[in-house]
UniProtKB/Swiss-Prot annotation:
The gene is katG. It catalyses: H2O2 + AH2 = A + 2 H2O; 2 H2O2 = O2 + 2 H2O. PANTHER family: CATALASE-PEROXIDASE, HYDROPEROXIDASE I, BIFUNCTIONAL CATALASE-PEROXIDASE. GO terms for biological process: cellular response to hydrogen peroxide; hydrogen peroxide catabolic process. One of its GO terms (cellular component) is cytosol. The keyword Cell cycle does not apply. GO terms for molecular function: catalase activity; heme binding; metal ion binding. This is Catalase-peroxidase. Binds 1 heme b (iron(II)-protoporphyrin IX) group per dimer. There is a cross-link at W101-Y248 (Tryptophyl-tyrosyl-methioninium (Trp-Tyr) (with M-274)). Residues 213-232 are annotated as: Disordered. It comes from Xylella fastidiosa (strain Temecula1 / ATCC 700964). The record marks R98 as: Transition state stabilizer.
Length: 757
């Protein structure tokens, strides 16, 4: 047989691959239309990216975990220094604390996104942020343990637990640990990290105030500039970091200007945006900086590209360091070279001893970064890799903020004088930091879950009564139907209660009945006057039912959801379809004292396209805000679409406005919204140059037929959403529309029922 590899006169030219290019290299829709609506955000984290399959139950796997053995292995790892990445001071504790902190510290209360709950530090962009240099090594050090325990411990849980064990192995008593973080398998696309196009840029989030970190040769005047800028600048919402690629603040000071007071203002703003008060902020900074060190052995130009830009042979590791050995005493991360205490592997009060025990003068690290050295001090700080050397005490600009800001100073001096209270405050703040995005306590797993209930966990009372049965529900539905409340009142109230849920940090929802409490009862979007009428009526129904003998009761939280279902059933019946809206009792009513008003304030919607509501002054196009709201509600694009169509014809719009109510059968669960939106007999035009509101007129006569908002019209304009709208506008779609609406409605009503999982 002829060797097909042999050359011949006919095949002398080099063989070419017939597939020269792939879709990755081609021009994409986003390149042509950069402002295209991101409907794809509603289809993240599908089973197609999950190797464990849709039947995998992490909670069940976690229960099989030998938790004590896992912790023993983590304790052993802390002092098992590896030649490929030696431990500072012979202990990896500082590195693992930083890893856990930076995993959890991306959380922001504004939209609940970020945080440790999904193990996102493994993926871009977080795995390549400038603030996360060397954390790739920390995760590789954990890999043998992750490999050993497999799917019984998620990466998300392991990263946080490693930080906890690091603290414990250095003599600190933690507040506890809860498992339950479920890994995702691709980067979150819905998180807005900012619009800067350069690492460490801040020009957009502060309105062209900063362009990135700089290190001026002369810092004279830099303090005045930083102070002026930090006084006047406003950080863009919902961001909680001062520069692209940082977790919180620039440790050198605002824009690299070494001004402790200006740094304090940045610290207060960013920590508040992740729900930390001043005491928690001081405890976290001082507690975290009791351990370990920063690394700035040489200038940053010795460091190679981040993991996502690395070559194949680097195997996902980044920041290859060409200086010296590239590790140990030659390590470069932040560019700062600071060890805060004499006991970097042991819990102590040394941070405050040094903070107040010395005067400080400005200096630079070997990498050229601004830091502070103690005046007239002896070299008492251990070297991380040479026991024969001692170093001078050093601090960061952001550390000195705790001394020179008057509020932080008072707290710091109190902690200095009361180390037991400092330890307790740090333990609680650390637990809050690492568990803030986990939602209610019912999601917590493991033997170290603290018994104490904390207000930031949005507690709800346990069920202490006998739940209603099917016969009771029929009687209650009859009472609701006879109460005089209309379909729109029932539906809009239930939606207002349940739709506060955020899949990001698992907060909000109908359980707890907080719609009846401050601040939610007074939110503009919840129509306080109408709400008070509905709640008063439902309370009468509740009181009458609960007055019966025995222990059977219904909460107001349950009754609100049940009443919404009654409204949907009535509207479906008007459309000729008799069905039962799913309802599972078991919600309880929280008390006002169990509700942190300031913590709940960020849950207030400044836009809710499902109710055709946008707060005045909002500049983001409302259709984009609709996608954001739908994503927080964990809705798919079809679910979002059918809910919009249904809520419009049920009269759920805030204020009863007629925009988007494309029907003459208000209160009937019809598919009229889609039929009339897609009617080519209607011609649409904006009412004003702002293009917020549109009129739909008869193409022949010019007569006004409808008015609609951007949210309404996008279901006919956007090609993806129009394709979905066409399904529900078809002649044979009425029953499918109703049943799909009920399924999506029920999903939203039960999003926070983690007790049912």
């Amino acid at each position: 047989m002829r060797d097909m590899r042999a050359s011949s006169p006919e095949t002398t030219s080099a063989v070419k691959c017939p597939f020269n290019k792939t879709a990755v290299e081609g021009t994409h829709n986003k390149d042509w239309w950069p402002n295209q609506l991101r409907v794809d955000l509603l289809h993240q984290h599908s089973n197609k990216s999950n190797p464990l399959g849709e039947t995998f139950d992490y909670a069940k796997e976690f229960q099989k975990l030998d938790y004590a053995a896992l912790k023993r292995d983590l304790h052993a790892l802390m002092t098992d220094s590896q030649d490929w990445w030696p431990a500072d001071f012979g202990h990896y504790g500082g590195l693992f604390i930083r890893m856990a902190w930076h995993s959890a510290g991306t959380y922001r209360i504004g939209d609940g996104r970020g945080g440790a709950g999904r193990g996102q530090q493994r993926f871009a962009p977080l795995n390549s942020w400038p603030d996360n240099v060397s954390l790739d090594k920390a995760r590789r050090l954990l890999w043998p343990i992750k490999k050993k325990y497999g799917q019984q411990i998620s990466w998300a849980d392991l990263i946080v637990l490693a930080g906890n064990v690091a603290l414990e192995s250095m003599g600190f008593k933690t507040f506890g640990f809860a498992g339950g973080r479920v890994d995702t398998w691709e980067p979150d696309q819905d998180v807005y990290w900012g619009r800067e196009m350069t690492w460490l840029g801040g020009d957009v989030r502060y309105g062209a105030v900063s362009e990135g970190v700089h290190h001026p040769d002369e810092h004279r005047g830099a303090k005045e500039k930083a102070s002026k800028n930090s006084d006047s600048r406003v950080l863009e919402n919902p961001l909680a970091a001062v520069q692209m690629g940082l977790i919180y603040v620039n440790p050198e000071g605002p824009d690299g200007c070494p001004d402790p007071l200006a740094s304090a203002r940045d610290i207060r703003e960013t920590f508040a945006r992740m729900a930390m008060n001043d005491e928690e902020t001081v405890a976290l900074i001082a507690g975290g900086h009791t351990f370990g060190k920063t690394h700035g052995a040489a200038p940053a130009d010795n460091v190679g590209p981040e993991p996502e830009a690395g070559e194949l042979e680097q195997q996902g590791l980044g920041w290859h360091n060409r200086f010296g050995s590239g590790k140990a005493g030659d390590t470069i991360t932040s560019g700062l070279e600071v060890t805060w205490t004499k006991t970097p592997t042991q819990w102590s009060n040394d941070f405050f001893e040094h903070l107040f025990g010395y005067e400080w003068e400005l200096t630079k690290s070997p990498a050229g970064a601004y830091q502070w050295v103690a005046k007239d001090a002896a070299a008492t700080i251990p070297h991380a890799h040479d026991p024969s050397k001692k170093l001078l005490p050093m601090m960061l600009t952001s550390d000195l903020a705790l001394r020179f800001d008057p509020v932080y100073e008072k707290i710091s001096r109190h902690f200095h004088a009361h180390p037991d209270q400092f330890a307790d405050a740090f333990a609680r703040a650390w637990f809050k930091l690492t568990h803030r995005d986990m939602g209610p306590r019912v999601r917590y797993l493991g033997p170290e879950v603290p018994a104490e209930e904390l207000i930031w966990q949005d507690p709800v009372p346990k069920v202490s009564h006998v739940l209603v049965d099917a016969q009771d529900l029929l009687a209650l539905k009859h009472k609701i139907s006879a109460s005089g409340l209309g379909i729109s009142q029932l539906v809009s109230t239930a939606w207002a209660s349940a739709s506060t849920f955020r899949g990001s940090d698992k907060r909000g929802g109908a359980n707890g009945g907080r719609l009846c409490l401050a601040p939610q009862s007074q939110w503009e979007v919840n129509q306080p006057q109408q709400l008070s009428v509905v709640l008063e009526t439902l309370r009468r129904v509740q009181a009458e039912f609960n007055a019966q003998a025995g222990d059977k009761r219904i909460s107001l939280a349950d009754l609100i959801v049940l009443a919404g279902g009654v409204g949907v059933e009535q509207a479906a019946k008007r459309a000729g379809i008799v069905l039962e809206v799913p309802f599972v009792p078991g919600r309880t009513d929280a008390l006002q004292e169990q509700t942190d008003v300031s913590s709940f304030a960020p849950l207030e919607p400044f836009a809710d396209g499902f109710r055709n509501y946008v707060k005045e002054g909002c500049v983001v196009p409302s259709e984009h805000l609709l996608i954001d709201r739908a994503q927080l509600l964990t809705l798919t694009a079809p679910e979002m679409t059918v809910l919009i169509g249904g809520l419009r014809v049920l009269g759920a719009n805030v204020g009863g406005v007629k925009h988007g109510v494309f029907t003459d059968r208000l209160g009937t669960l019809s598919n009229d919204f889609f039929i009339n939106l897609l009617d080519m007999g209607t011609e649409w035009a904006p009412v004003s140059k702002e293009r917020h509101l549109f009129e739909g007129r008869d193409r022949r006569t010019g007569a006004l037929k409808w008015t609609g908002t951007r949210v309404d019209l996008v279901f006919g304009s956007n090609s993806l959403l129009r394709a979905l709208a066409e399904v529900y506008a078809a002649v044979d779609a009425q029953e499918k529309f109703v049943r799909d609406f009920v399924a999506a409605w029920s999903k939203v009503m039960h999003l926070d029922r983690f007790d049912l999982v």
